[in-house]
Amino acid sequence: VYEVDAFMVNNLDPFELDQCSNSNFDLTKQTYDTFTKWTNKNETFFCAHNGYGFDYMLTSQHLFSNLHSWPWIFSTGNARQLDSLPIVQNFDFYSPNKIKFEINEKNNKIYRLGSLCKANGFEIKNLHSSRGDTEGLAKLMALLREKDPSLFRQSLSFTNKQNVLENIKAIDYFCHPETFYGRTRQFTSSYLCEHPQFKNYHLVFDLKHDPELIFQEKSNKVLEKTLNGAPKKYRTIKVGKNPFIQDKSFATKFDDEYAKLGHEVLQERANFIMKNRKEIAERICLIINDKFEEQTIDQTELIPEQMIFNLNPSSNDKTLMNKFVMTNDKDEQKRIHKNFDGPLKHLSEMILLDKYDKDGFDSKEEYRKVRKNISRRLLSTNKEVFPTIPEGMARIDTLREEKKDDKIGLEKVERINSHLEKLASEHESYL
């Protein structure tokens, strides 16, 4: 089943989508094959607006759910991932007034793709469609390149995480911007270590704080309160997400705490970090690990589709997954399905149902068992981690009230409602 708002925002008709010939699995495979064909030839830059917050993870999640054994295609080999949202935010900070913005009711700049394109003279006619958003994004990136070629090139130079890591580890201190609630500010930091819990996340010490004063504290319990008390004394750089690293000369270019300290003090603090990096990193990692152990562990059982970070298929399972994806033979996929167990069996079951319906199973009993399990989940009145039909119908009621004076919008709502009612009737027949 689907999110009602996704159909509203993207102006989609669920009845029309029912007529599409491609299964979810087939479309995912075609997308994967196209992307890997590009990256096998040359270095390929993928770009999405708010991609780090949505598109890249969603695509990887989709690949995982369709049994691709390596779903991280945007950060592998020749693939490079970019996100135009932080690039625009950094442009506005380091090269202000080069691009135009719409302003919201709180007098804040709007960074949504459609708004940016409209403000800069190339409004997306078919907003939220694949073609419309792609063309709008291409024009936005071309505008940034035109307005400040040097800054644009610099924005593309941090896509190789190994190069980023080598760079920030080798220099004494550097600058890096972060954006919170629409406001960008620059930090000046010195490298510490990799985060002990999250791969490719690296900790840096914020040099507006005096590390020598802070780390003279012998008690880790007291130190933990100091480090994590506002403002936090260390920050995180995600080296795999194109972080913008600025030369340390920028530390004093703005009227802020770093400018008041001056390069002499910043250099002294960076030297202290570099000289004592191993000991400092060990203490911080110990504090972070202890904190993670203290936190209440969420005992909620993950459904198979959520296990992209938790499921570690064996080499044999990965071989079977690859064979399942590569073959176009229904009987071969059914045979492989029987060799899976646990979450992988569930995922392959969903693919067989989506792709072949009844023909994906050896008996009517097996087919009805699968359908009954799905129907039970989708008709659940509990709060689930996936969209349910009752949840969709409740959203329809809300949208009816919101769209009561919008004839076209209300027609869309009723069209989706008719489709939901049809789905509900179909699923009820399997209970």
Cite the ranges covered by each PLM segment.
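Non-catalytic terminal regions of proteins
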Residues: L213-F215, E224-L431
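Acidic catalytic cores of enzymes that act on phosphate-bearing nucleotides/polynucleotides
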Residues: S157-I237
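Metal-dependent phosphoesterase core characteristic of DEDDh/y 3'-5' exonuclease domains
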Residues: V1-L12, W38-P149, S155-F158, N322-F340, ...
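Amphipathic, soluble alpha/beta structural segments
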Residues: K125-E166, Q216-E264
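Conserved DEDDh/DEDDy metal-dependent 3′-5′ exonuclease domain
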Residues: F7-S95, A251-K318
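Generic detection of long, well-ordered alpha-helical segments
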Residues: S21, F25, G53, R131-T134, ...
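Conserved, well-structured beta-alpha core segment at the onset of a catalytic domain
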Residues: K41, F174-C175, Y430-L431
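Conserved RNase H-like, two-metal-ion catalytic cores of nucleic-acid enzymes
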Residues: V1-K29, D33, K37, P196-Q197, ...
